[in-house]
Amino acid sequence: MYHSILEAFRVENNKDVKWYVMADDDTLIFVDNLVELRGTYDHTKYYYIGTNSESIHSNAYISFDMGYGGAGYALSYALVEALASEIDGCIQRYKHLFFSDYISQSCSADLGVDLKIEKGIHQFDISGLLSSHPSSPLISLHHFDAIDPIFPSKNRSESINHLMKPAKFDQSRLFTYLSKHFPSKLSEETPPTFRPWQKSRPPFFMFNTRWLSNNPCEAPHVFFLESVIESNNIGRYHVVVTNYTRSSPGNLPICLSNGNPSANPIHKIQVFSPSTGRKEAGRIECCDVKYVAGEDTVDVKLSACMKGEMLA
């Protein structure tokens, strides 16, 4: 499989080609975000871009320095050009390595090129509700033929089709909504609402987690995508309206210790985002939250953060 990079280079050997991207056939690629990401790198320099596994066990078994082919990785034109004359010898040198993506990492390392990790690329060696997606554009999701459907009322193919509905409007904000009423540092430690790909001893994951709690002030309320529309009836602006509904009844005990009212009455969340501009990669957006006590709907309006606004 790694040799196919050389074949592609020979067929398309011209300066109009900037990147060579490898991924598995069970990987979902968000092309708009991928193109924007590649535009932040100089393809005339040596770049090897990808991610490792979310699972410590997988990385320890294979490599912590490898861009996993399932998640997808990209090689700049300059790097492939440098590899082209050496690729046959490199494959022979590393023929004992079982995985083609491991060979790719090894050959790149022989040129002194290390993996540049991008957090929006997902190997998905976990299964469950990924509430730890970073504030980076969503580039890829792997293992869609094996992981649990991301929408509990749908099968895998239905889940993919449902996810692509908001992707048609705006990929830059996809998978970026997560509301937590905790101190900002604690909110970076997601509760493990997912499980590792394979059974192993902890620690399991390559990111910060905290134990699930029965405390009603800490238990998550989960809402799933229901619909998305573009509307020009909201004032003078065109907006994308994304609706989320509660996945199960809010039957948790009322949380009173932190002085906040219970979220149990809320059954729907409407998110209003600009339809004319993509979210800037690597930047957070701020929001205004409108909720009337006793109602079952919360309105969230996204906008660029004003000077001085920050997570607190």
Label every model-predicted segment.
Residues 1-312:
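Secretory-pathway lumenal glyco-enzymes, predominantly type II signal-anchor Golgi glycosyltransferases
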